[in-house]
Amino acid sequence: MSAAPDFSKRYRVDNGRKFRLKDFDPRDSSGLKSKKHAEKELPRGIERLSELQDKLYAQDRWAILLIFQAMDAAGKDGAIKHVMSGVNPQGCQVYSFKQPSPEELNHDFLWRTSKCVPEHGRIGIFNRSYYEEVLVVRVHKELLERERTPPSLVTKNIWNERFADINAYEHYLFRNGVVIRKFFLNLSKEEQKKRFLSRLEEPAKNWKFSASDVAERERWHEYMVAYEEMIQRTATPHAPWYVVPADKKWYTRLMVADAIISALEDLNLHYPAVSAAKRKELKAARVALEHEGHH
């Protein structure tokens, strides 16, 4: 993206030890004042993303897993929709993880997402993910009971254990050719209120609103503490977090696109080389096609 080469780097966290959420401003747009500028840049970014995805698919070696986590109304759906709009649907899969089903609750906490990890050559997108297990389940500890974990295993160390499990799992995926990029869309409490009110005022947005949204808002501080520790404990060089400002949707989308492009460019993707035997075969096929009907 010409005006923003690796612009998203300032929001990248690949070592969480010193991470503090208060150091990241949800309103930031790093000097980009105009939505117009972003609207010109985003299509260029999407075009570049589409070229890279085509090579990823053809090369069939790496997979990309993009994970989106955020508070309600932060713009996860919109970011996914706008940024991935130019990507070939054959090479991209989106999974939204809602409340777990009884079947999912009867399995280990990574089971439902493991089935959806993208195969080589594909981009997989998780709209929410296994990170819910250290977010909503941590804020609402009664949810642990529904997970049917033996009580003797639910100790005060459970969150540390889950962070360790997630880190080991992401390391395992990386060693198997899955490149992970994780996005926390960092929305301010004031902006969430505005977006909730607009959902209530606009009939076309009413369906997005749920009474539980307001109840969850009352636990905002608890969620911020959970998000901060999640990033501190699971940001690694092979699976970094991007703490993307989310108060300006146009800026969020630009930064998400930039981070995905930079992850793909790091892979030095190219179309598979054609062997001499294959070239010979192609030449013969061309000759046959050109001589069709000349008998």
For each feature predicted by the language model, list its residue ranges.
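Flexible, compositionally biased loop and terminal segments
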Residues: 1-295
